[in-house]
């Protein structure tokens, strides 16, 4: 009743709401995906957030990560990955593994996986009808899978490749916004 009697206030509230919605829609939303969401995808999430912040673009991007499996749901980031991030001054303490959902497909502009196995499993969760799925290193000059350091134990190579992929992905996105 109050809103109808004070149309000026009602109009102001609606205008603020519409402005907030537009700001959200302008934001580029990226979801990084790997098998368990404890190594590669959270590493990509936090390296990309750091890259975006250093570019002064943190208000223009929303970034998360998820898993294709249920195996690690609720667990924190794997300790060697946490050390990599901590050594860079990046806080990841509150990150917990979660599984990709069908709703993620509608909520994110880019859904970026680490390898072909992830890509196949993402399509089992929800088919890529809008062309949102890519492997991270597909944006580089040398497209290939990011090896899983859980098995390879080569965290340095994984870190280097993910950093290269994030830089290439950001360049791709910014070029396509123009």
Predicted regions and their residues:
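Short, positively charged and aromatic/hydrophobic N-terminal segments
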Residues: 4, 11-17, 23
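Compositionally biased, intrinsically disordered low-complexity segments enriched
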Residues: 6, 17-19, 82, 178
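Feature targets compositionally biased, intrinsically disordered low-complexity regions
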Residues: 7-10, 19, 130, 164
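Conserved active-site segments centered on acidic
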Residues: 25-107, 171-178
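Phosphate-binding/catalytic loops
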Residues: 110, 116-178
């Amino acid at each position: 009743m109050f809103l109808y009697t004070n149309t000026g206030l009602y109009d102001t509230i609606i205008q603020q709401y519409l402005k907030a919605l537009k700001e959200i829609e302008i934001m580029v939303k990226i979801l990084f995906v790997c098998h368990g969401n404890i190594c590669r995808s959270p590493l990509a999430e936090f390296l990309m957030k750091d890259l975006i912040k250093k570019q002064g673009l943190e208000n223009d991007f929303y970034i998360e990560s998820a898993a294709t499996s249920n195996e690690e749901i609720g667990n924190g980031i794997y300790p060697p990955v946490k050390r990599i991030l901590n050594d860079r001054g990046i806080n990841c303490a509150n990150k917990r593994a979660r599984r990709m959902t069908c709703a993620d497909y509608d909520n994110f502009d880019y859904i970026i996986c680490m390898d072909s196995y992830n890509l196949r499993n993402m399509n089992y969760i929800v088919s890529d009808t809008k062309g949102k799925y890519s492997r991270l290193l597909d944006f580089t000059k040398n497209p290939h899978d990011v090896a899983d350091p859980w098995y390879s134990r080569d965290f340095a190579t994984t870190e280097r490749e993910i950093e290269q992929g994030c830089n290439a992905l950001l360049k791709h996105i910014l070029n396509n916004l123009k």
